[in-house]
């Protein structure tokens, strides 16, 4: 993604994980074949489901060990745009995240013709860093200014003096407290559906589509304009 070969995790040969689409009233049955050399799990973010299907290892289920298969099975009792991701270690940060879409039933009293039946485009926004997730985690614990320096958002002593906040800067540094920022981590690339850009060439001017957007980022906030 950023010009360097790095370790990542693909599911069904892709990053992000495949979009999963259901309709309210369905029963989801998802087979997870773990071909990694480590344990894994999948968490269904924001879904109403039986606790044992929630996907938190060593809390609601045992970890899915390497070389084994686990089946998640739960009823779809809601509609909306959600996402799913690994809940094991830092696997989410290197590829294990994806879109989870639940469509409204056509006989639902709130079904909107011309909206709920539009062609759907799942979009997952995320980020990529060439640093290993463990190193990112370590640097955050060290409370260094490295990521702020990379983003160009550090405040110099001269700037603190001009703002009348020199004592505040000294005090915060003494407490190893980082300066406030929108996001703590610098990323080399921001991705849309696992790519630097995404073209929807199947549509033409005048077509209507429904974008189902999920933030699959580890620590980024996204502001979209249309």
Residue map of PLM features:
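Histidine-centered copper-binding motifs that mark active-site loops
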Residues: 1-226
């Amino acid at each position: 993604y950023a010009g360097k070969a790095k370790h990542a995790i693909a599911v069904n040969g892709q990053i992000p994980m495949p979009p999963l689409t259901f309709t309210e009233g369905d029963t989801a049955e998802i087979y997870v074949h773990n071909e990694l050399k480590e344990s894994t799990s999948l968490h269904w973010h924001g879904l109403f489901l039986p606790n044992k299907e929630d996907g938190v290892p060593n809390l609601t289920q045992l970890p899915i060990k390497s070389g084994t298969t686990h089946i998640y099975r739960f009823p779809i009792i809601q509609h909306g745009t959600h996402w799913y991701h690994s809940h094991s270690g830092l696997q989410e940060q290197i590829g294990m995240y994806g879109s989870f879409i639940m469509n409204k039933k056509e006989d639902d009293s709130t079904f909107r013709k011309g909206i709920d039946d539009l062609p759907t485009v799942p979009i997952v926004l995320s980020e990529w860093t060439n640093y290993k997730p463990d190193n990112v985690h370590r640097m955050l614990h060290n409370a260094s200014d490295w990521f702020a320096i990379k983003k160009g958002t550090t405040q110099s002593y001269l700037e603190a003096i001009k703002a009348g906040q020199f004592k505040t800067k000294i005090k915060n540094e003494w407490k190893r407290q980082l300066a406030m920022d929108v996001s703590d981590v610098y990323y080399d690339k921001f991705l849309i559906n696992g790519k630097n850009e995404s073209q929807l060439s199947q549509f033409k001017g005048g077509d209507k589509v429904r974008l189902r957007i999920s933030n699959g980022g580890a620590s980024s906030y996204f502001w979209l304009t249309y």
